[in-house]
């Protein structure tokens, strides 16, 4: 029988202002986990902490943090651990600026690596020891299809997401026998604010409109449409559950853009 219950588990989700992160927080909570998440502004915190979970046992707590800054990330980790150890970590925070390689400075590269990659490294390094100690843990890296199929317009983004996949596989090999399962999720075209922004930029450059761009891009997916944040959250929830006890080191794409 499929067991998706997360009752009694404590989870952390980074970058949950909206989109995939928000959906993951809600779904983990609905399945019984108590979730701590971070966002950059108070409105996002309030919006999500007011969510009425389907589970009477779960709690949702939001903390303001800028995960592109080491000190802010460390403060988030410290405050989270003050309430006890973590069983589940979902490294979701990230940005995907579209820019020309020839005009990207060293600072541009460093800033995106701090946010997309080093935030995940810092959180994993801090929360993983307890998982090893108790012989049970889940670490999910929200990577991207760009980590496997790089885009000319998202060079630095793709590089950070490729690195997340590599780190995930290495950690899976290192800690799998300790009961800590580490996997990557590679969302493709998911209808989020990020893709709406990208569609708008394409539309402006081509003289079209964003809705037409989204529809056309959706046809490149075998299913014929963009995915939803909730569909990504469903996969994450499964990977965090006991029913995913033999999935380790996987890099799961959804949905395929390239076949």
PLM region spans:
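Substrate-binding pocket helix/loop in short-chain dehydrogenase/reductase
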Residues: 100-101, 108-113, 217
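Residue(s) in the substrate-gating loop at a strand-loop-helix junction
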Residues: 144
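Alpha-helical segment proximal to the catalytic Tyr-Lys
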Residues: 129, 173-174, 245
